[in-house]
Amino acid sequence: MKLLLALAGLLAPLAMLQTSNGATPALLGEVENSVVLSCMEEAKQLVDRAYKERRESIKRSLQSGSASPTELLFYFKQPVAGTRTAVRAADYLHVALDLLKRKLQPLWPRPFNVTDVLTPAQLNLLSVSSGCAYQDVRVTCPPNDKYRTITGHCNNRRSPTLGASNRAFVRWLPAEYEDGVSMPFGWTPGVNRNGFKVPLARQVSNAIVRFPNDQLTKDQERALMFMQWGQFLDHDITLTPEPATRFSFFTGLNCETSCLQQPPCFPLKIPPNDPRIKNQKDCIPFFRSCPACTRNNITIRNQINALTSFVDASGVYGSEDPLARKLRNLTNQLGLLAINTRFQDNGRALMPFDSLHDDPCLLTNRSARIPCFLAGDMRSSEMPELTSMHTLFVREHNRLATQLKRLNPRWNGEKLYQEARKIVGAMVQIITYRDYLPLVLGPAAMKKYLPQYRSYNDSVDPRIANVFTNAFRYGHTLIQPFMFRLNNQYRPTGPNPRVPLSKVFFASWRVVLEGGIDPILRGLMATPAKLNRQNQIVVDEIRERLFEQVMRIGLDLPALNMQRSRDHGLPGYNAWRRFCGLPQPSTVGELGTVLKNLELARKLMAQYGTPNNIDIWMGGVSEPLEPNGRVGQLLACLIGTQFRKLRDGDRFWWENPGVFSKQQRQALASISLPRIICDNTGITTVSKNNIFMSNTYPRDFVSCNTLPKLNLTSWKET
């Protein structure tokens, strides 16, 4: 039987068919192709209208100076260029499927998957008409490629899109959505998960994460630079863009001002007796991550990674070709990255300013008129500490390109740029795997998950796993509530040596007008990180006061992490323990044994009812730390597994024979982050040994003169 639908409604009623046992049939009927295409056309109109309303809304807010922090954040997480094209296609597809389901729903009161009424040919028709199909066009790779592509394409010659930008995350376990397709758990009131009520994310944050700031424990064996490298690294490998609209596709509802729940709005509801937010009808705004076009099952929602997955310094160089070109100085043949033409930092380069038509960084200090910086990752102006890291590596690229030009006067600008880029990429890999990851995982987990490098393996999948984007947020447990700035004697400097984090977001002016990056880098080296303890998980500066200074309501980062895991359809705590081959607790006592903390186990069970439902971030950061590591068993497995895949599945990994010569590899082995700081700043005394561990001046510090420089002799062409 054919079921003919018209966009205005049903042409004829359909008798409800049931199988003999009362179950929903696998196939409801067949929809006319014209109806499928009509829904797609309507979807395109709805999506385009919502995108346009968003652009006009934020433009008005920025021009009037009334932009909220969520609007500022949107500027840094909005899909742009190729990402925007990919996201728009996925939005067309998902809205069209939703429209089809809405029109079928009156015919079938039971839950069903819309794909049950579509033929494979019609699913392909949706993929083509949305634009999703065109993201899988065949990539032709050059026969000889000495350098990475900017986009990550062709790293794997057998499967050229693996690890490339603007592709879906890989799922290590199947998605778990409330409806089996796209709706997150917690969306529909009264719908249980594994037989238990889904707790409000804000309620879990209040009950388990909250602690008084004056009880904060400083980490005696980790510098704040340990936290900062984690963020810089994360921004090299993952960016999950938020929707290009803040308005409901179907009703035009503004997600920022309304607490109603309509896609893409998934606001955090406020529990009773909240310590800060007294109006229970209020909410914390939240927007679902952009969907991705997926090749195999086009209906089960996945998310998109806007960046290359490889550890390749894409935060310096970009993950799309137009941005990469924009970041370069193409006025000469010197292979340089572009620098700021208006300001310097004590005679040293700053990054260029972005050319945003309406710049959100201008709003953080209206009299200073300092725009956002332009970098390989759009979040570089999010906080001055992050800006300092980006600036450091732009300077290092230009230093290397200049030295390589002296060694090889005949090299043209392209060759100089690519060779310097290749060295910087290797530096980020070495610092990450030699210095940073062992301090995250601890020696036992490091040996288990990241054994000695053997060789490149083209059967290893280097894509970022969806779960990793949540697991790597363990770094929020390391954050101190202040930005610290120190002078050359490592003493607090300037009128504001200790600025609350809530006052530094998007404040590019603090780098330009308040002393540059040197005091910030000293602060990162000589200040301890926060230690994650089971009763001191995340500071209130980012749990209660995130962006509160210009917003109707402060954001709660831990609660946002939990809501995000539900948005992404991530399985719960025990599913990931099983994935990692770890015991899966089922009772309070068993959970108490795993956590080595019965009181915490009781708190978690009071919220979730079962360990199966504990949000992956909450469960992960609750575990006792691995010996000499800063994560527990589960996060060590997930983080270690991801970074092994990023290493072994990278054809351009710095140790892979043929990437660098043996002599070049020997030279690169001596590089260090302290030496890079010495070479590109006015700092003359830096951390000795591992920069991520040393944190006490003068005990842990040495003169720059004692650190070996990178010898570029083996880059000289004969």
From Swiss-Prot:
Gene3D superfamilies, alphabetized: Haem peroxidase domain superfamily, animal type
Disulfide bonds: C141-C154, C255-C265, C259-C283, C361-C372, C580-C637, C678-C704
Residues bearing glycans: N113, N297, N329, N365, N457, N711
Keyword field: Calcium, Disulfide bond, Glycoprotein, Heme, Hydrogen peroxide, Iron, Lysosome, Metal-binding, Oxidation, Oxidoreductase, Peroxidase, Signal
Record carries keyword Zinc: no
Matching Pfam families: An_peroxidase
Catalytic activity field: chloride + H2O2 + H(+) = hypochlorous acid + H2O
Subcellular location: Lysosome
Gene Ontology CC: one annotated term: secretory granule
The record's free-text note on cofactor binding: Binds 1 Ca(2+) ion per monomer.
Cofactor(s) named in the record: Ca(2+); heme b
Positions annotated as propeptide: 16-138
Subunit description: Homodimer; disulfide-linked. Each monomer consists of a light and a heavy chain. Found in a complex with CP and LTF; interacts directly with CP, which protects CP antioxidant properties by MPO.
Protein name in UniProt: Myeloperoxidase
Gene (UniProt): Mpo
